[in-house]
Curated annotation (Swiss-Prot):
PROSITE patterns registered for this protein in UniProt: SPIDER_CSTX
Species this protein is from: Lycosa singoriensis
Prosequence residues removed at maturation: 21-41
GO molecular function, one term: toxin activity
Tissue expression pattern: Expressed by the venom gland.
Protein name: U1-lycotoxin-Ls1l
GO cellular component: extracellular region
Domain notes: The presence of a 'disulfide through disulfide knot' structurally defines this protein as a knottin.
């Protein structure tokens, strides 16, 4: 049973990794922003830093590229603004947790 769990976790990790790379490579917005500003590509945005102005500029983590996660913030004046930060999506966190758990058990 443990072997099946490890194989399934490995497959989920590999599929998530390859799909995140494939989706990022195919996004037209990212391609246009990279072509328009070569320096942005070289200077990525670290985890937990603001990415409101450059939603495709997040750095890579240990296994996956961080994703720009946005939320709507309401100021005291009642004005709504969008604030974004680079972070790890929940399904990537789960995959990293499974891989870390596997490393602890099997070395």
């Amino acid at each position: 049973m443990m072997k099946v769990l490890v194989v399934v976790a490995l497959l989920v990790t590999l599929i998530s990794y390859s799909s995140s790379e494939g989706i990022d490579d195919l996004e037209a917005d990212e391609l246009l922003s990279l072509m328009a500003n070569e320096q942005t590509r070289k200077e990525c945005i670290p985890k937990h830093h603001e990415c409101t102005s450059n939603k495709h500029g997040c750095c890579r983590g240990n296994f996956f590229k961080y994703k720009c996660q946005c939320t709507t913030v309401v100021t005291q004046d009642g004005e709504q603004t969008e604030r974004c930060f680079c972070g790890t999506p929940p399904h990537h966190k789960a995959a990293e947790l499974v891989v870390g758990f596997r490393k602890k058990i099997f070395g």
